[in-house]
């Protein structure tokens, strides 16, 4: 991906950083449904952190084509960066409506609810997504994070396990799993998650080790 997200909220940055290249990218610059000239314009506005300009550009294009999921994503991103989380959620809901089989839309919608401090709605959104089609490592990770927001460590651990089963090198999911086990006091399971992080040479291993629970 070409365009970074220096201004994202921590939650949104976390979502986009799930892309395998390990950066904090945005999908805006490579959307096939957006003309090259507009992709460049999007990149320029994002680089300037001109969220009002980006919102206006998205709305102008949506006035011509209300069925463009790409422009709904751009609009949602702009609203999110401007702190308008409810508007962002409304835009991402349109993405889900237009492309229900695309897990990206569901993930963005769930993440927008987390940004708005509504983790229960994020959980409901991701569970609905998993009824539509099989989840990805990323959607299961987000579900684990959403349950963790609610201090529901048992379902969080279950979701994180689904994530690492789909991607055994997903360090942040292993960290979430270990953290859930620590909160549950499950020392043996915690040690397995920690060992895996150490095998991955992840800096998260040190952070997780500090959460080691008492034996149980």
Language model region names:
Residues 33-81:
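Alpha-helical segment of the N-proximal tetratricopeptide repeat
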Residues 46, 73, 80, 114, ...:
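Position-specific recognition of the canonical hydrophobic site in helix A of tetratricopeptide repeat
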Residues 47-56, 81-94, 115-128, 150-162, ...:
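Structural signature of tandem alpha-helical TPR/SEL1-like repeats
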Residues 64, 98, 132, 166, ...:
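Structural marker of alpha-solenoid helical repeat scaffolds
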Residues 74, 108, 142, 176, ...:
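Canonical tetratricopeptide repeat
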């Amino acid at each position: 991906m070409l365009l970074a997200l220096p201004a994202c909220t921590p939650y949104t940055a976390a979502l986009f950083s799930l892309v395998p290249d390990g950066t904090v990218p945005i999908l805006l610059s490579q959307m096939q449904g957006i003309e090259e000239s507009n992709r460049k314009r999007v990149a320029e506005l994002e680089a300037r952190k001109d969220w009002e300009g980006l919102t206006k550009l998205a709305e102008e294009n949506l006035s011509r084509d209300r069925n463009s999921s790409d422009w709904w994503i751009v609009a949602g991103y702009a609203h999110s960066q401007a702190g308008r989380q409810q508007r962002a959620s409304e835009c991402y809901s349109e993405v889900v409506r237009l492309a229900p089989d695309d897990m990206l839309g569901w993930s963005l919608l769930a993440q927008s609810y987390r940004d708005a401090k509504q983790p229960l709605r994020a959980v409901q959104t991701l569970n609905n997504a998993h009824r539509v089609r099989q989840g990805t490592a990323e959607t299961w990770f987000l579900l684990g994070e959403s349950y963790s927001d609610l201090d529901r460590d048992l379902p969080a651990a279950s979701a994180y396990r689904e994530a690492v089963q789909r991607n055994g090198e997903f360090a942040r999911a292993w960290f979430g799993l270990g953290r859930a086990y620590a909160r549950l006091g499950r020392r043996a399971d915690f040690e397995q998650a920690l060992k895996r992080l150490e095998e991955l040479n992840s800096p998260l291993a040190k952070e997780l080790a500090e959460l080691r629970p008492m034996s149980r």
